[in-house]
Amino acid sequence: MGLPWYRVHTVVLNDPGRLLSVHIMHTALVAGWAGSMALYELAVFDPSDPVLDPMWRQGMFVIPFMTRLGITNSWGGWGIAGGTVTNPGLWSYEGVAGAHIAFSGLCFLAAIWHWVYWDLEVFYDERTGKPSLDLPKIFGIHLFLSGVACFGFGAFHVTGLYGPGIWVSDPYGLTGKVQPIKPTWGAEGFDPFVPGGIASHHIAAGTLGILAGLFHLSVRPPQRLYKGLRMGNIETVLSSSIAAVFFAAFVVAGTMWYGSATTPIELFGPTRYQWDQGYFQQEIYRRVSAGLAENQSLSETWSKIPEKLAFYDYIGNNPAKGGLFRAGSMDNGDGIAVGWLGHPIFRDNEGRELFVRRMPTFFETFPIILVDGDGIVRADVPFRRAESKYSVEQVGVTVAFYGGELNGVSYSDPATVKKYARRAQLGEIFELDRATLKSDGVFRSSPRGWFTFGHASFALLFFFGHIWHGARTLFRDVFAGIDPDLDAQVEFGAFQKLGDPTTRRQGA
């Protein structure tokens, strides 16, 4: 036919059998990728330390999505929360991956069958004998079926009525687990961080989809609307489908980047805003203050801070610190976290407690400044070797550790104090193993960052695709010179021009 690469899809423009075939093949590719990617991730995933080396630090992308839907165990005998599992059952990580690959194979065979047997009776209008698809009716069928699936997911899977429930975390990502969810029907259900809204919204949206599907199956569109919106043209379907996809992609990019009940930090890592707002730091200080109010020592209170909570309060886990095009997992960047050294408390020679000003998200370097409780600068580490009235040496800064591996240890040596002040810029201080993975020390983003970037980028591209195909279908006769009422199967590389009966036509 001599079609350019960007026009090859016109071969299925008015060939319903092969249009169906290529869509089944697309489903096969998507399911096959998901299953294969899951098996690859399971082959490289190390489940031994769910606190300091969780899935998101290891760059896992599909495992978190399986986990949030209720899959927590592996046929390898491990569970996502640590420990061993004796009876993981059919729906383990490997079971889900295998089901996707098997489904992919069946779709592959179905696609081949429909490509070979494309000329089916069902695709012909019995009144005219010409190939025809009743697109409004097909829309109704799809809307009804997707409504059933949506309702079923919300009413059965999420609620635990027939299914495991979904992953639910506390606000600080410490005690998350899979559990059934009760639908939330009040205004609080619209809070993106309330899991009950997931159940209620799927039930409501599914009900609406079922009713809308039945409506479109039983009511025909008016002729003017049918012609005005080009409801008989398959490119109208393409345009509106792209609109649905780009809208969904924009929404999930937002829920992933800003955080929501659907994207728990235990599975996808913390958001950048939790670092920007000192979210975990505030909770840590709240717990410490509560302990001190009960007459516990600093050492006791800091020792009770969960290592998991302290690890969230480290800038290396901020998804905005990794460059978009730095390949690899977070572990390939700053290394594998081995242990929390403890919380450093700095004091000057007058006994004032000093706080290291933390590095903002979008800085690669930042001056090391120590301020007192009133925010007054008391010490710093100058960029140049220079005399400074605020220097660590002149101010006599010391550091003492509470909690963690260095609990009770203090240092007054200026070089050591500066080293820990520099590290305290980055939040809580952790020992990091860079040797195992040959980590380069340059921060990487988490799957939260990749997912957001990918979906926002494709949403933008698909937005332009929607405009393009929408314009083409609305103004097809103007743009292409193709008769909008053309229903013969023609070879679209040799165009049938509007008003030109001499243009070569070839029946399919």
From Swiss-Prot:
Which is one GO molecular function term here?
A: chlorophyll binding
Any one GO BP annotation for this protein: photosynthetic electron transport in photosystem II
Which is a Gene Ontology cellular component entry for this protein?
photosystem II
TM helices/strands, residue ranges: 21-36, 101-115, 140-156, 203-218, 237-252, 457-472
The disulfides recorded in the entry are none
Q: Where in the cell is it found?
A: Plastid membrane
Membrane topology for this entry? Multi-pass membrane protein
Give the record's cofactor note, including how many are bound: Binds multiple chlorophylls. PSII binds additional chlorophylls, carotenoids and specific lipids.
Question: Which keywords describe this protein according to UniProt?
Answer: Chlorophyll, Chromophore, Membrane, Photosynthesis, Photosystem II, Plastid, Transmembrane, Transmembrane helix
The entry assigns this protein to a family as follows:
Belongs to the PsbB/PsbC family. PsbB subfamily.
Q: Give the protein's biological function.
A: One of the components of the core complex of photosystem II (PSII). It binds chlorophyll and helps catalyze the primary light-induced photochemical processes of PSII. PSII is a light-driven water:plastoquinone oxidoreductase, using light energy to abstract electrons from H(2)O, generating O(2) and a proton gradient subsequently used for ATP formation.
Q: Subunit composition?
A: PSII is composed of 1 copy each of membrane proteins PsbA, PsbB, PsbC, PsbD, PsbE, PsbF, PsbH, PsbI, PsbJ, PsbK, PsbL, PsbM, PsbT, PsbX, PsbY, PsbZ, Psb30/Ycf12, at least 3 peripheral proteins of the oxygen-evolving complex and a large number of cofactors. It forms dimeric complexes.
Protein name per Swiss-Prot or TrEMBL: Photosystem II CP47 reaction center protein
Which species is the source of this protein?
A: Cuscuta reflexa (Southern Asian dodder)
Its gene name is psbB
